[in-house]
Amino acid sequence: MTLLDAKEFDPEKESRKRNRLILIITVAVIVIFLAWVFRYWREEHIVRTFFDALQKQDFKTAYAIWMHDPDWARHPGEYANYPFNDFYLDWGPGGKWGRINTARVNGAHTCPGPSSGVLVDVIVNDRTEHAQVWVEKSNHTLSYPPCELIFR
């Protein structure tokens, strides 16, 4: 086959190829955009579950979420650095936030520089001061954040 014997140009076939390429690029852009928007969904969900337990005043479940260990009561010695009693003083009705009636995740972001977790900002009881909780990416434990970020 020589150049002069080339197949005839088929505009329908070329149109289908172009449309397929446009569709693939559009889907890829949408997937990348959604992945970026929901990049902290898991961490936000963990914190939302934690605050749901606090709203129900189920402090043992909240502590299990904080430590990411549902069987924490079987081996409380492993958590001597932040025992349940200290947790209850911080997050119970007598703690900084008082009785938690409402909690709404306001945003999430990593701290500046290299970080191993995500800071989740929560509006508690519609106060102007926000609670901020650190979620460690590797094991999903919660703690107090190493930095403070301002969310709008």
For the regions a language model picked out, list residue spans one by one.
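Short extracytoplasmic
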Residues: 52-89
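N-terminal Lys/Arg-rich, disordered targeting/topogenic segments
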Residues: 1-17
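A broad, low-specificity signal for short, low-complexity segments enriched in glycine/proline
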Residues: 9-14, 22-24, 77-82, 91-97, ...
